[in-house]
UniProtKB/Swiss-Prot annotation:
Family statement: Belongs to the ribosome association toxin RatA family.
InterPro entries: COQ10-like, COQ10_START, START-like_dom_sf
CDD domains linked: COQ10p_like (cd07813)
Function description: Toxic component of a type II toxin-antitoxin (TA) system. Binds to 50S ribosomal subunits, preventing them from associating with 30S subunits to form 70S ribosomes. Its antitoxin is unknown.
The gene coding this protein: ratA
Identification of the protein by name: Ribosome association toxin RatA
A molecular-function term among this protein's GO annotations: ubiquinone binding
Keywords annotated in UniProt: Toxin-antitoxin system
Signal peptide per UniProt: none
Gene Ontology BP terms: cellular respiration
Organism: Rickettsia prowazekii (strain Madrid E)
């Protein structure tokens, strides 16, 4: 299983960053490996989404259940679990924690592919791809959050 975690202080309000990550349909506009994104069903706290990922000549589609939570102390959470596709297991969590200078962003992801070959291929790019994803979200925040 591959794992990654990232923590950073960003100069934006938690709700603004939460809204950015919750806007799954916009991912193809700024995530380098996301070729398509579609919402299958949604309500205020849960989305079933379909993403098409292209990386190093491979294209894979998967569905996820994405759930948001706002805690009593103002922490915004987005939890994602893959429900179909090439993952034996995928879980990620975004936490947006109020901070004196904006938001403490915490991101966690761990996953395992169903194919050993895919697992090895993705594994060799996993850290780089995840870091690029975080940077893409940060760049998007600079562009769209006022």
């Amino acid at each position: 299983m591959l794992s990654f975690q990232h923590t950073k202080i960003l100069p934006y309000k938690p709700k603004k960053l939460f809204d950015l990550v919750w806007d799954i349909k916009s991912y193809p506009q700024f995530l380098p490996w996301c070729a398509a994104a579609r919402i299958i069903s949604e309500n205020n706290q849960e989305v079933i989404s379909e993403l098409v990922i292209q990386l190093k000549g491979l294209s894979e589609k998967y569905n996820s259940r994405v759930i948001n939570t706002i805690t009593d102390n103002g922490i915004y959470l987005i939890d994602t679990v893959a429900i179909s596709g090439p993952f034996e297991y995928l879980k990620s969590t975004w936490q947006f924690i109020p901070h004196s200078t904006g938001t403490e962003l915490k991101f966690f992801i761990n996953f395992k592919m169903t194919s050993v070959i895919l697992d090895k291929l993705i594994g060799s790019y996993f850290t780089i791809a995840t870091e690029k994803m975080i940077l893409a979200f940060e760049k998007r925040a600079k562009e769209v959050i006022k």
